[in-house]
């Protein structure tokens, strides 16, 4: 029996080659597999089969000199681990769990000589990673993400403000003013606007700086912690580790317990914070990658199969789109 053959369709297949190529191109985009199937007028199963054709082999013979660690939520209540090349943004690995055993078992598959080539690891302030990074990468410096260091300070200031505010009468003008303009206390004082606007709470035209001065006049305790908070922000943003930690050590026993907790954490992680101030590396690139991962997951309404999710991440982030130029045909 003669069977017609064509270069358009692979032998013993029904889906044209061009459709398979389109599926591969669409998988690079941050859209769901159901949407891909709908756009190409094929079944979702066909898209999944094409996804399963992708295979990503780990290269255990090399690691980048600078890499970033972070975690992301795969399913509700379950965090997964991700490592990225800091320079070219390629994903090094995506692991289903973030426990020390899971991470250790993966990186021990690399020879010690390969692991010793890693010089910098950027990460969030997640203490279980610290010892693990030192064990696996003995030559690497740990650099904490600057955003999360400032976030710790900001949260301490916010909690102190709330505690002081709750000591006031809830019907009082002072309570309402602090609650209404709480963002001014959290904001960097150098970024406060000096434009006058009518403020209903005070029934007059005031700048943000004038409002802040009124808020601080309601409580000496609030004023003291605000001034300390702003000084710490100033030294941190100016990358002055000696002044930053000098201020912490001088005020450790005098501040609110909420600030004491943060200060003790900073002193314990002093070396890693100094690295963050002296080196220009951060976890910002990996945070941006995590936002793309969240977008992939959200567009797909979540993933039940971790391997499929992992493949979508590698396809979207490690396979670069080829740029094509449109050529106008002449009539």
Show where each model-derived region lies.
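Active-site beta-loop-alpha junctions of metal-dependent nucleic acid enzymes
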Residues: 12-14, 92-114, 120
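Gly-rich Lys/Arg/Thr-decorated short loops/hinges at beta-loop-alpha junctions or inter-strand turns
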Residues: 3-7, 84-90
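Short alpha-helix plus adjacent loop in nuclease-associated cores
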Residues: 149-170
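Short, positively charged, Gly/Tyr-enriched micro-motifs
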Residues: 1-67, 72-78, 115-118, 122, ...
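Secondary-structure boundary/capping signal
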Residues: 35, 44, 91, 140-141
